[in-house]
Protein backbone atom coordinates (compact mmCIF):
# COMPACT_ATOMS: atom_id res chain seq x y z
CA UNK A 1 0.00 0.00 0.00
CA UNK A 2 1.44 3.39 -0.91
CA UNK A 3 1.69 6.25 1.54
CA UNK A 4 -1.00 8.12 -0.43
CA UNK A 5 -3.43 5.19 -0.40
CA UNK A 6 -2.82 4.63 3.26
CA UNK A 7 -3.53 8.26 4.05
CA UNK A 8 -6.93 8.05 2.41
CA UNK A 9 -7.95 5.12 4.58
CA UNK A 10 -6.03 5.99 7.74
CA UNK A 11 -8.96 7.72 9.44
CA UNK A 12 -10.84 4.41 9.45
CA UNK A 13 -8.40 2.74 11.84
CA UNK A 14 -6.43 3.53 14.93
CA UNK A 15 -3.17 5.43 14.35
CA UNK A 16 -0.20 3.08 14.04
CA UNK A 17 2.86 3.85 16.16
CA UNK A 18 6.32 2.45 15.37
CA UNK A 19 8.70 2.54 18.35
CA UNK A 20 12.33 2.33 17.18
CA UNK A 21 14.73 1.30 19.95
CA UNK A 22 18.12 -0.46 20.13
CA UNK A 23 17.26 -2.00 23.52
CA UNK A 24 14.35 -3.88 25.09
CA UNK A 25 13.86 -6.18 28.08
CA UNK A 26 10.55 -7.81 27.17
CA UNK A 27 7.44 -7.37 25.07
CA UNK A 28 3.81 -8.36 25.70
CA UNK A 29 3.05 -11.90 24.54
CA UNK A 30 0.20 -10.64 22.38
CA UNK A 31 2.63 -8.80 20.13
CA UNK A 32 3.96 -11.97 18.49
CA UNK A 33 5.28 -15.47 19.05
CA UNK A 34 8.85 -14.24 19.61
CA UNK A 35 7.97 -11.65 22.27
CA UNK A 36 9.10 -13.81 25.17
CA UNK A 37 12.55 -14.29 23.63
CA UNK A 38 13.46 -10.64 23.21
CA UNK A 39 15.81 -9.30 25.85
CA UNK A 40 18.71 -7.00 24.97
CA UNK A 41 19.68 -4.55 27.67
CA UNK A 42 22.57 -2.15 28.18
CA UNK A 43 20.86 0.31 30.52
CA UNK A 44 17.64 2.00 31.53
CA UNK A 45 16.57 2.57 27.91
CA UNK A 46 15.72 -1.14 27.65
CA UNK A 47 13.47 -1.03 30.72
CA UNK A 48 11.80 2.18 29.66
CA UNK A 49 11.18 0.94 26.11
CA UNK A 50 9.67 -2.29 27.41
CA UNK A 51 7.45 -0.53 29.94
CA UNK A 52 6.19 2.02 27.41
CA UNK A 53 5.42 -0.55 24.72
CA UNK A 54 3.70 -2.83 27.24
CA UNK A 55 1.57 0.02 28.58
CA UNK A 56 0.62 1.24 25.09
CA UNK A 57 -0.29 -2.31 24.09
CA UNK A 58 -2.36 -2.82 27.25
CA UNK A 59 -4.21 0.45 26.60
CA UNK A 60 -5.17 -0.81 23.15
CA UNK A 61 -2.80 1.23 20.98
CA UNK A 62 -1.70 -0.12 17.59
CA UNK A 63 1.96 -0.16 18.58
CA UNK A 64 4.81 -1.81 16.65
CA UNK A 65 8.45 -2.18 17.65
CA UNK A 66 11.62 -2.14 15.56
CA UNK A 67 14.84 -3.40 17.13
CA UNK A 68 18.04 -5.11 16.00
CA UNK A 69 17.96 -8.89 15.71
CA UNK A 70 20.39 -9.87 18.46
CA UNK A 71 20.12 -13.61 17.86
CA UNK A 72 22.60 -14.65 20.51
CA UNK A 73 21.09 -12.41 23.17
CA UNK A 74 17.61 -13.58 22.17
CA UNK A 75 18.79 -17.20 22.63
CA UNK A 76 17.75 -18.21 19.13
CA UNK A 77 19.55 -21.29 17.80
CA UNK A 78 21.61 -19.70 15.06
CA UNK A 79 22.60 -23.04 13.61
CA UNK A 80 19.02 -24.16 13.05
CA UNK A 81 17.35 -20.82 12.40
CA UNK A 82 19.13 -19.17 9.50
CA UNK A 83 17.75 -16.05 7.84
CA UNK A 84 15.52 -17.78 5.27
CA UNK A 85 13.93 -20.00 7.89
CA UNK A 86 13.42 -17.02 10.17
CA UNK A 87 11.51 -15.20 7.45
CA UNK A 88 9.24 -18.23 7.02
CA UNK A 89 8.78 -18.41 10.78
CA UNK A 90 7.83 -14.75 10.95
CA UNK A 91 5.46 -15.07 7.99
CA UNK A 92 3.27 -17.34 10.11
CA UNK A 93 2.67 -14.44 12.50
CA UNK A 94 0.38 -12.07 10.58
CA UNK A 95 -0.43 -10.17 13.77
CA UNK A 96 3.19 -9.78 14.81
CA UNK A 97 4.07 -6.24 15.76
CA UNK A 98 7.74 -7.05 16.33
CA UNK A 99 10.06 -6.12 13.47
CA UNK A 100 13.67 -7.27 13.69
CA UNK A 101 16.42 -5.48 11.79
CA UNK A 102 18.42 -8.18 10.03
CA UNK A 103 22.19 -7.82 9.72
CA UNK A 104 25.04 -10.15 10.54
CA UNK A 105 26.62 -7.49 12.75
CA UNK A 106 23.80 -8.05 15.27
CA UNK A 107 23.53 -11.84 15.16
CA UNK A 108 26.52 -12.89 17.25
CA UNK A 109 26.76 -10.04 19.72
CA UNK A 110 26.79 -10.58 23.49
CA UNK A 111 26.13 -6.91 24.26
CA UNK A 112 24.04 -4.15 22.70
CA UNK A 113 26.97 -1.76 22.34
CA UNK A 114 30.63 -2.35 21.59
CA UNK A 115 33.62 -1.19 23.60
CA UNK A 116 35.00 0.02 20.28
CA UNK A 117 33.86 3.55 19.51
CA UNK A 118 34.34 2.84 15.80
CA UNK A 119 31.96 -0.11 15.82
CA UNK A 120 28.95 1.53 17.47
CA UNK A 121 28.21 3.91 14.56
CA UNK A 122 28.37 0.92 12.19
CA UNK A 123 25.77 -0.87 14.31
CA UNK A 124 23.59 2.26 14.26
CA UNK A 125 23.86 2.51 10.47
CA UNK A 126 22.93 -1.14 9.95
CA UNK A 127 19.91 -0.69 12.22
CA UNK A 128 18.90 2.53 10.47
CA UNK A 129 19.24 0.96 7.01
CA UNK A 130 16.85 -1.85 7.89
CA UNK A 131 14.37 0.51 9.56
CA UNK A 132 14.29 2.88 6.57
CA UNK A 133 14.48 0.37 3.73
CA UNK A 134 12.33 -2.46 5.09
CA UNK A 135 10.51 -1.89 8.37
CA UNK A 136 8.91 1.51 7.74
CA UNK A 137 7.62 0.55 4.25
CA UNK A 138 6.18 -2.67 5.71
CA UNK A 139 4.58 -1.17 8.84
CA UNK A 140 3.33 2.06 7.21
CA UNK A 141 3.27 3.92 10.54
CA UNK A 142 1.33 7.09 11.20
CA UNK A 143 3.93 8.18 13.74
CA UNK A 144 7.47 7.06 14.56
CA UNK A 145 8.94 7.23 18.06
CA UNK A 146 12.75 7.12 18.05
CA UNK A 147 14.98 6.62 21.07
CA UNK A 148 18.49 8.00 21.58
CA UNK A 149 21.46 8.53 19.28
CA UNK A 150 21.41 5.13 17.53
CA UNK A 151 18.12 6.13 15.89
CA UNK A 152 19.20 9.72 15.22
CA UNK A 153 19.08 9.50 11.41
CA UNK A 154 15.52 8.15 11.29
CA UNK A 155 13.70 11.45 12.05
CA UNK A 156 15.37 13.12 9.06
CA UNK A 157 14.14 10.38 6.74
CA UNK A 158 10.72 10.35 8.41
CA UNK A 159 10.34 14.08 7.80
CA UNK A 160 11.15 13.49 4.12
CA UNK A 161 8.46 10.77 4.04
CA UNK A 162 5.90 13.03 5.70
CA UNK A 163 5.67 10.91 8.86
CA UNK A 164 5.63 12.82 12.18
CA UNK A 165 8.41 11.72 14.51
CA UNK A 166 8.94 11.96 18.27
CA UNK A 167 12.55 11.73 19.44
CA UNK A 168 13.31 10.83 23.06
CA UNK A 169 16.63 11.96 24.53
CA UNK A 170 17.52 9.35 27.16
CA UNK A 171 21.11 10.50 27.64
CA UNK A 172 23.61 12.97 26.22
CA UNK A 173 25.92 10.54 24.40
CA UNK A 174 26.32 10.89 20.65
CA UNK A 175 28.47 9.75 17.72
CA UNK A 176 29.62 11.44 14.54
CA UNK A 177 29.88 10.12 10.98
CA UNK A 178 29.91 11.36 7.39
CA UNK A 179 27.41 11.19 4.55
CA UNK A 180 29.86 8.91 2.76
CA UNK A 181 29.66 6.43 5.64
CA UNK A 182 25.87 6.63 5.57
CA UNK A 183 25.88 5.92 1.83
CA UNK A 184 28.32 3.03 2.18
CA UNK A 185 25.96 1.35 4.66
CA UNK A 186 23.21 1.13 2.03
CA UNK A 187 21.20 4.21 3.01
CA UNK A 188 20.23 6.73 0.34
CA UNK A 189 21.37 9.76 2.31
CA UNK A 190 20.79 12.13 -0.61
CA UNK A 191 17.05 11.77 0.02
CA UNK A 192 17.17 13.47 3.40
CA UNK A 193 20.66 14.91 3.89
CA UNK A 194 19.30 18.42 4.39
CA UNK A 195 17.34 17.23 7.46
CA UNK A 196 20.49 16.27 9.38
CA UNK A 197 22.67 18.28 11.77
CA UNK A 198 26.31 18.88 10.79
CA UNK A 199 29.36 20.17 12.62
CA UNK A 200 29.38 23.15 10.23
CA UNK A 201 26.71 24.64 7.99
CA UNK A 202 26.44 22.49 4.83
CA UNK A 203 26.54 24.25 1.45
CA UNK A 204 25.60 21.29 -0.72
CA UNK A 205 25.59 17.51 -0.65
CA UNK A 206 28.89 16.89 -2.42
CA UNK A 207 30.73 19.52 -0.41
CA UNK A 208 29.55 17.92 2.83
CA UNK A 209 29.84 14.29 1.77
CA UNK A 210 33.30 13.41 3.09
CA UNK A 211 34.35 16.09 5.53
CA UNK A 212 31.30 17.58 7.25
CA UNK A 213 30.41 15.23 10.08
CA UNK A 214 26.85 14.44 11.15
CA UNK A 215 25.98 14.57 14.86
CA UNK A 216 23.57 11.67 15.34
CA UNK A 217 21.92 12.77 18.59
CA UNK A 218 21.60 16.40 17.48
CA UNK A 219 20.23 15.21 14.12
CA UNK A 220 17.48 13.32 15.89
CA UNK A 221 16.49 16.44 17.81
CA UNK A 222 16.87 18.74 14.79
CA UNK A 223 14.74 16.70 12.38
CA UNK A 224 12.03 15.41 14.68
CA UNK A 225 8.68 17.13 14.98
CA UNK A 226 8.63 16.86 18.77
CA UNK A 227 11.16 15.81 21.41
CA UNK A 228 11.12 14.81 25.03
CA UNK A 229 13.63 14.27 27.76
CA UNK A 230 12.93 11.66 30.41
CA UNK A 231 12.34 14.09 33.26
CA UNK A 232 11.06 17.68 33.40
CA UNK A 233 13.99 18.99 35.45
CA UNK A 234 16.63 17.56 33.12
CA UNK A 235 15.00 19.43 30.24
CA UNK A 236 15.06 22.62 32.32
CA UNK A 237 18.74 22.05 33.18
CA UNK A 238 19.66 21.65 29.50
CA UNK A 239 17.70 24.69 28.35
CA UNK A 240 19.17 26.87 31.12
CA UNK A 241 22.74 25.67 30.50
CA UNK A 242 23.30 24.21 33.96
CA UNK A 243 25.63 21.45 32.70
CA UNK A 244 28.74 22.49 30.78
CA UNK A 245 29.47 18.90 29.72
CA UNK A 246 26.39 18.65 27.50
CA UNK A 247 27.50 18.97 23.84
CA UNK A 248 26.82 22.46 22.52
CA UNK A 249 25.02 21.21 19.41
CA UNK A 250 22.65 19.05 21.43
CA UNK A 251 21.94 21.81 23.95
CA UNK A 252 21.21 24.40 21.25
CA UNK A 253 18.91 22.11 19.27
CA UNK A 254 16.97 21.20 22.41
CA UNK A 255 16.70 24.90 23.21
CA UNK A 256 15.34 25.55 19.72
CA UNK A 257 12.70 22.85 20.13
CA UNK A 258 11.82 24.20 23.57
CA UNK A 259 11.39 27.76 22.24
CA UNK A 260 9.12 26.39 19.52
CA UNK A 261 6.93 24.66 22.11
CA UNK A 262 7.96 21.24 20.80
CA UNK A 263 9.80 19.87 23.85
CA UNK A 264 8.58 18.34 27.08
CA UNK A 265 9.94 16.30 29.97
CA UNK A 266 8.18 13.02 30.71
CA UNK A 267 9.24 11.14 33.80
CA UNK A 268 10.01 7.50 33.15
CA UNK A 269 8.58 4.84 35.43
CA UNK A 270 9.95 1.56 36.77
CA UNK A 271 8.86 -1.66 35.15
CA UNK A 272 5.69 -3.29 36.44
CA UNK A 273 7.79 -6.26 37.58
CA UNK A 274 9.50 -4.00 40.15
CA UNK A 275 6.91 -4.92 42.74
CA UNK A 276 7.79 -6.35 46.17
CA UNK A 277 4.35 -7.96 46.36
CA UNK A 278 5.12 -10.32 43.46
CA UNK A 279 8.88 -10.18 42.83
CA UNK A 280 10.15 -13.77 42.34
CA UNK A 281 13.75 -12.77 43.12
CA UNK A 282 13.20 -11.83 46.76
CA UNK A 283 13.03 -14.12 49.76
CA UNK A 284 9.73 -12.85 51.19
CA UNK A 285 7.21 -10.76 49.26
CA UNK A 286 5.54 -7.86 51.06
CA UNK A 287 3.56 -4.66 50.78
CA UNK A 288 3.47 -1.41 52.72
CA UNK A 289 1.56 -3.01 55.60
CA UNK A 290 3.87 -6.02 55.98
CA UNK A 291 7.24 -4.54 55.07
CA UNK A 292 8.91 -4.66 58.49
CA UNK A 293 9.36 -8.37 59.06
CA UNK A 294 9.65 -9.17 55.36
CA UNK A 295 12.49 -6.73 54.85
CA UNK A 296 14.31 -8.23 57.84
CA UNK A 297 14.08 -11.68 56.28
CA UNK A 298 15.20 -10.33 52.91
CA UNK A 299 18.11 -8.54 54.56
CA UNK A 300 19.45 -11.74 56.08
CA UNK A 301 19.06 -13.59 52.77
CA UNK A 302 20.90 -10.83 50.92
CA UNK A 303 23.64 -10.61 53.53
CA UNK A 304 24.22 -14.33 53.20
CA UNK A 305 24.48 -14.15 49.40
CA UNK A 306 26.93 -11.23 49.26
CA UNK A 307 29.06 -12.19 52.26
CA UNK A 308 27.97 -9.59 54.80
CA UNK A 309 27.50 -10.29 58.51
CA UNK A 310 24.00 -11.69 58.92
CA UNK A 311 22.10 -9.31 61.17
CA UNK A 312 18.61 -7.94 60.34
CA UNK A 313 19.00 -5.01 62.74
CA UNK A 314 21.95 -3.22 61.12
CA UNK A 315 21.46 -0.32 58.67
CA UNK A 316 22.20 -1.38 55.10
CA UNK A 317 23.02 0.98 52.21
CA UNK A 318 22.65 -0.41 48.68
CA UNK A 319 24.29 0.77 45.43
CA UNK A 320 22.46 -0.60 42.34
CA UNK A 321 23.73 1.68 39.52
CA UNK A 322 26.69 1.11 37.20
CA UNK A 323 29.97 2.35 38.67
CA UNK A 324 30.49 5.16 36.18
CA UNK A 325 32.48 8.11 37.61
CA UNK A 326 31.46 10.37 34.71
CA UNK A 327 27.81 10.32 35.80
CA UNK A 328 26.89 8.13 38.74
CA UNK A 329 29.26 9.51 41.41
CA UNK A 330 30.95 6.37 42.82
CA UNK A 331 34.06 8.44 43.57
CA UNK A 332 32.05 10.44 46.11
CA UNK A 333 31.30 7.26 48.04
CA UNK A 334 34.89 6.04 47.73
CA UNK A 335 36.15 9.35 49.15
CA UNK A 336 34.12 9.06 52.36
CA UNK A 337 33.75 5.30 52.70
CA UNK A 338 36.49 4.67 55.27
CA UNK A 339 35.59 7.68 57.44
CA UNK A 340 31.87 6.96 57.30
CA UNK A 341 32.29 3.29 58.17
CA UNK A 342 34.73 4.16 60.96
CA UNK A 343 32.26 6.58 62.55
CA UNK A 344 29.55 3.93 62.54
CA UNK A 345 31.64 0.81 63.11
CA UNK A 346 29.98 0.07 66.45
CA UNK A 347 26.58 0.43 64.83
CA UNK A 348 27.74 -2.22 62.33
CA UNK A 349 26.64 -0.22 59.27
CA UNK A 350 26.87 -2.14 56.01
CA UNK A 351 27.23 -1.07 52.38
CA UNK A 352 26.63 -3.37 49.40
CA UNK A 353 27.39 -2.59 45.77
CA UNK A 354 25.83 -4.82 43.11
CA UNK A 355 27.13 -3.11 40.00
CA UNK A 356 29.60 -3.33 37.15
CA UNK A 357 31.79 -0.51 35.89
CA UNK A 358 35.27 0.91 35.75
CA UNK A 359 35.10 2.07 39.38
CA UNK A 360 34.56 -1.38 40.80
CA UNK A 361 38.30 -1.92 41.39
CA UNK A 362 38.75 1.03 43.79
CA UNK A 363 36.00 -0.42 45.99
CA UNK A 364 37.66 -3.84 45.95
CA UNK A 365 40.92 -2.11 46.95
CA UNK A 366 39.22 -0.29 49.84
CA UNK A 367 37.57 -3.51 50.98
CA UNK A 368 40.85 -5.44 51.10
CA UNK A 369 43.15 -2.64 52.31
CA UNK A 370 40.92 -1.72 55.26
CA UNK A 371 39.73 -5.30 55.80
CA UNK A 372 36.06 -4.35 55.78
CA UNK A 373 35.01 -7.95 55.33
CA UNK A 374 31.45 -8.54 56.45
CA UNK A 375 30.67 -4.82 56.36
CA UNK A 376 31.33 -3.95 52.70
CA UNK A 377 30.32 -6.12 49.73
CA UNK A 378 31.30 -5.48 46.10
CA UNK A 379 29.56 -7.76 43.60
CA UNK A 380 29.09 -7.92 39.85
CA UNK A 381 25.67 -6.89 38.63
CA UNK A 382 23.04 -9.62 38.69
CA UNK A 383 19.38 -8.80 38.14
CA UNK A 384 18.04 -11.19 40.77
CA UNK A 385 20.61 -10.12 43.35
CA UNK A 386 19.88 -6.47 42.62
CA UNK A 387 16.16 -6.99 43.18
CA UNK A 388 16.89 -8.72 46.47
CA UNK A 389 19.17 -5.78 47.36
CA UNK A 390 16.27 -3.34 47.08
CA UNK A 391 14.11 -5.58 49.27
CA UNK A 392 16.87 -6.04 51.84
CA UNK A 393 18.29 -2.54 52.13
CA UNK A 394 17.22 0.44 54.16
CA UNK A 395 18.71 3.03 51.81
CA UNK A 396 19.48 3.21 48.08
CA UNK A 397 22.49 5.31 47.03
CA UNK A 398 22.07 7.42 43.85
CA UNK A 399 24.54 10.37 44.12
CA UNK A 400 24.64 11.13 40.38
CA UNK A 401 26.36 14.22 38.97
CA UNK A 402 23.52 14.46 36.46
CA UNK A 403 20.54 12.20 35.91
CA UNK A 404 18.28 12.41 32.86
CA UNK A 405 15.74 10.34 34.78
CA UNK A 406 17.01 7.58 37.02
CA UNK A 407 15.06 4.49 37.99
CA UNK A 408 16.87 3.17 41.12
CA UNK A 409 15.56 5.98 43.32
CA UNK A 410 11.99 5.11 42.26
CA UNK A 411 12.46 1.36 42.62
CA UNK A 412 13.97 1.93 46.06
CA UNK A 413 10.83 3.73 47.21
CA UNK A 414 8.61 0.91 45.94
CA UNK A 415 10.65 -1.56 48.01
CA UNK A 416 10.90 0.61 51.13
CA UNK A 417 14.59 1.45 50.57
CA UNK A 418 14.76 5.22 50.93
CA UNK A 419 16.96 6.96 48.33
CA UNK A 420 20.01 9.07 49.10
CA UNK A 421 20.42 11.38 46.10
CA UNK A 422 22.06 14.45 44.64
CA UNK A 423 19.52 17.14 43.78
CA UNK A 424 19.60 16.97 39.98
CA UNK A 425 17.47 16.02 36.98
CA UNK A 426 15.08 13.15 37.52
CA UNK A 427 16.30 12.77 41.10
CA UNK A 428 14.96 16.25 41.84
CA UNK A 429 11.61 15.30 40.31
CA UNK A 430 11.21 12.12 42.34
CA UNK A 431 12.87 12.64 45.73
CA UNK A 432 11.98 15.16 48.44
CA UNK A 433 14.04 15.42 51.61
CA UNK A 434 12.43 13.46 54.43
CA UNK A 435 10.90 15.11 57.47
CA UNK A 436 9.84 12.08 59.55
CA UNK A 437 8.14 14.14 62.25
CA UNK A 438 5.85 15.76 59.67
CA UNK A 439 5.41 12.57 57.62
CA UNK A 440 6.70 14.37 54.53
CA UNK A 441 9.36 13.54 51.97
CA UNK A 442 10.71 10.26 50.72
CA UNK A 443 14.51 10.33 50.86
CA UNK A 444 17.67 12.25 51.66
CA UNK A 445 18.82 14.99 49.30
CA UNK A 446 22.15 16.86 49.11
CA UNK A 447 22.48 19.92 46.88
CA UNK A 448 26.25 20.43 46.41
CA UNK A 449 27.88 17.69 44.35
CA UNK A 450 30.85 16.66 46.47
CA UNK A 451 31.75 13.93 48.94
CA UNK A 452 30.82 16.11 51.93
CA UNK A 453 27.32 16.49 50.53
CA UNK A 454 26.93 12.73 50.20
CA UNK A 455 28.38 12.23 53.68
CA UNK A 456 25.81 14.69 55.10
CA UNK A 457 22.92 12.92 53.38
CA UNK A 458 24.07 9.49 54.59
CA UNK A 459 24.31 10.87 58.13
CA UNK A 460 20.71 12.07 57.83
CA UNK A 461 19.76 8.56 56.75
CA UNK A 462 21.44 7.12 59.85
CA UNK A 463 19.57 9.64 62.01
CA UNK A 464 16.32 8.40 60.50
CA UNK A 465 17.33 4.81 61.16
CA UNK A 466 17.74 5.70 64.85
CA UNK A 467 14.18 7.07 65.08
CA UNK A 468 11.60 5.20 67.13
CA UNK A 469 10.49 2.06 65.27
CA UNK A 470 6.91 3.28 64.91
CA UNK A 471 8.10 6.55 63.30
CA UNK A 472 10.41 4.72 60.93
CA UNK A 473 7.83 2.11 59.93
CA UNK A 474 5.08 4.69 59.44
CA UNK A 475 7.22 6.76 57.08
CA UNK A 476 8.51 3.78 55.10
CA UNK A 477 4.97 2.48 54.60
CA UNK A 478 3.86 5.93 53.46
CA UNK A 479 6.74 6.21 50.98
CA UNK A 480 5.91 2.78 49.57
CA UNK A 481 2.23 3.63 49.11
CA UNK A 482 2.95 7.01 47.53
CA UNK A 483 5.58 5.53 45.23
CA UNK A 484 3.22 2.81 44.04
CA UNK A 485 0.56 5.39 43.21
CA UNK A 486 2.96 7.74 41.45
CA UNK A 487 5.57 5.60 39.69
CA UNK A 488 3.76 3.32 37.26
CA UNK A 489 4.11 2.83 33.54
CA UNK A 490 0.43 3.51 32.79
CA UNK A 491 0.90 7.09 33.97
CA UNK A 492 4.03 7.34 31.82
CA UNK A 493 2.26 5.84 28.79
CA UNK A 494 -0.65 8.27 29.09
CA UNK A 495 1.80 11.17 28.95
CA UNK A 496 3.24 9.77 25.72
CA UNK A 497 -0.24 9.20 24.33
CA UNK A 498 -0.99 12.89 24.90
CA UNK A 499 2.04 13.80 22.78
CA UNK A 500 1.13 11.27 20.07
CA UNK A 501 -2.41 12.65 19.88
CA UNK A 502 -1.14 16.22 19.76
CA UNK A 503 1.17 15.33 16.88
CA UNK A 504 -1.49 13.31 15.02
CA UNK A 505 -4.37 15.63 15.86
CA UNK A 506 -6.65 12.66 16.56
CA UNK A 507 -7.19 10.06 19.31
CA UNK A 508 -4.74 7.20 19.58
CA UNK A 509 -7.08 4.88 21.44
CA UNK A 510 -10.84 5.18 20.99
CA UNK A 511 -11.61 4.48 24.63
CA UNK A 512 -8.83 6.69 25.98
CA UNK A 513 -10.08 9.52 28.12
Task: Give short role names for the model-derived ranges.
Residues 1-513:
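Catalytic cores of nucleotide-sugar-dependent glycosyltransferases that transfer UDP/GDP/TDP-activated
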